[in-house]
Amino acid sequence: MNESLTEKRNELSLSFAALGVVFGDIGTSPLYAFGQVIKYFPINDYNIYGILSLIFWSLIIIVSIKYLVIVFRADNDGEGGIIALAGVIRQKIKKPGGWLLFITLVGIGLIIGDGMLTPAISILSAVEGLESLSPNLAKYVLPVTLIILFFLFKMQSIGTGKIGVYFAPVMLVWFITIGILGFLQIIQNPKVLMAINPYYAINFFMIHQYSALFILGGVFLVMTGGEALFADLGHFGKKAIRTGWFAVALPALLLCYFGQGAFVLMHTEDIKYPFFSLSPDWFLPVMIILATLATIIASQAIISAAFSILKQASLLNLIPRLKIVFTSKFEKGEVYLPLINFILALGTCSLVVIFKSSSNLADAYGIAVNLDMLITTVLVGIIAYRCWSWHAFKILIFLLILIIELAFFAGNIPKLLTGGWIPVLIAFLGFVVMYTWHCGFEKLRELHHRDALMDAFIIDELNQNKISRQPGMGLYIIDPYDYEGESLLHHLRLNRIFFENMVFVSIKIENKPYIPIEDKFELIKKAEGFYLIFIHYGFTENINLPNELDEMFKRVYLPFDIIKNKLIYFIEIVFVEMTGERQKHMYLWQKHFFSLMIRNAVPDIQFYQLPYNNTIAIGTYYQF
């Protein structure tokens, strides 16, 4: 009984904490989404009922059913997100082909675009409440927004730290407040609740026909942030997120949207900001402050999610290695990526300056999230067919969801002409970077495979004791493109310097988020006094090689003593020289770009957190 009570308390505690992280983006959508939708058609009962019906069933079908019921089943050992889904498919399909890489890279690129747009539109829409307070304050909206964004990105380097504990209480107050404000309007015009009937959504399309598609781009804004429910699965778990959604977030959002619908039907004059119109004049300053705090929290969650997924991509070698700063001693997942933070800050502030209002930004917003949701639907559909063995009849569920999301995509297509091309361009540029990096590494792997054939004789000579050795031990760190240390063996062959004991360490990032300690180490004896050790990591884990080696030496038997402070680490630094010829899968500009990226990538000594005084770097030149 006590254990059950404790478990329920822990679940409620996690659900409460999830309010401050998971639901921030989707929870602040009422600030701009409804106002964006109603500008397309005249305000009358049938139009508002149709719009509210579309909003209601979008949140039910896409967010509640698709994500919380179906997609949640496709977790990768409790982890969610694009990379986790790709990992599940790779576990089942050993050689999935280039299509999975393509989808994964596009998905990551879209997340970068979302990381710029979400803080811009969220915070700008909150600060625009100043105009509702007084039209004279309109001139301060942009400067205040830019100041908030500056400090938001500035504080990333120190982490959220202690202030993070206040995120959930603020968001709970936010949801309660918007729910109450909406409810107060509904009781004055309860007829809006008829919009729950899907007849009004269908009737809306029958009346407006093809022109109704344009409104879907606006309706889709109510779901932006829905993908975060799955992406943050690893932090809070399924039960906590489902409880937080169905008990707090969803009811509050529906009350707020229906409340805005009730209000505009009672006040049919031109309403620029229907959300802030819900608030009484005496409460408006408090509402603006609360909205600003909520959007800052929502933006923080998106920025942290971008850091997290790009850290995973860096470990999986999908992007160049990035400098990773751990901002908390207690939360291992709390990281800061300086370069990414700068790119996001520059992009976000530029968007605010260019578009100037949340209404203009809304024209650019949504298409990236829409594409991300489509990718998720396709990947989970493949998992359902290949991993869950769903029959064709069940797979029709995904076909239905795909048709709905494609309809939303059709509604978002006109946004390409009014700013929607920006997130698509960001995603494309991200894809070019990642694909060029992938092609360059494939070329390096090809070159190392040739070296492996050349250096096989060294192992034979070591086995036959034909090579003289000097006392001591060398610990050689193998790069991802070098499966068994062929480049370092090549160096040894040229240098003729062989330690009495040599250990080659290869880091392998698996398609799972975490690797149990008992499965982490793999020892292979290559020759007398020459060992190859594989250390397996999950794609969400933090790499600290010296600490991992300490644990390894306790668990893996080696027939010689290890003196930690006398360990010498050998790493490779790669230099790429251009040949001027186009090679397979790489244009000349790609080779130059890859050379630039590999020169500026974080070196092994930093990435693996090796001791500077005990590390020797070996330079290797490759011709492309």
UniProtKB/Swiss-Prot annotation:
GO terms for molecular function: potassium ion transmembrane transporter activity; symporter activity. It catalyses: K(+)(in) + H(+)(in) = K(+)(out) + H(+)(out). Keywords: Cell inner membrane, Cell membrane, Ion transport, Membrane, Potassium, Potassium transport, Symport, Transmembrane, Transmembrane helix, Transport. It is a multi-pass membrane protein. It comes from the Bacteria. Pfam families: K_trans, K_trans_C. GO terms for cellular component: plasma membrane. It is found in: Cell inner membrane. The chain crosses the membrane at residues 14-34, 51-71, 97-117, 133-153, 163-183, 211-231, 245-265, 283-303, 335-355, 364-384, 393-413, 416-436. Its main location: membrane. Disulfide bonds: none annotated. HAMAP family: Kup. PANTHER family: LOW AFFINITY POTASSIUM TRANSPORT SYSTEM PROTEIN KUP (PTHR30540:SF79), OSMOTIC STRESS POTASSIUM TRANSPORTER (PTHR30540). Transport of potassium into the cell. Likely operates as a K(+):H(+) symporter. Belongs to the HAK/KUP transporter (TC 2.A.72) family. This is Probable potassium transport system protein Kup 2. It comes from Legionella pneumophila (strain Lens). The gene is kup2.
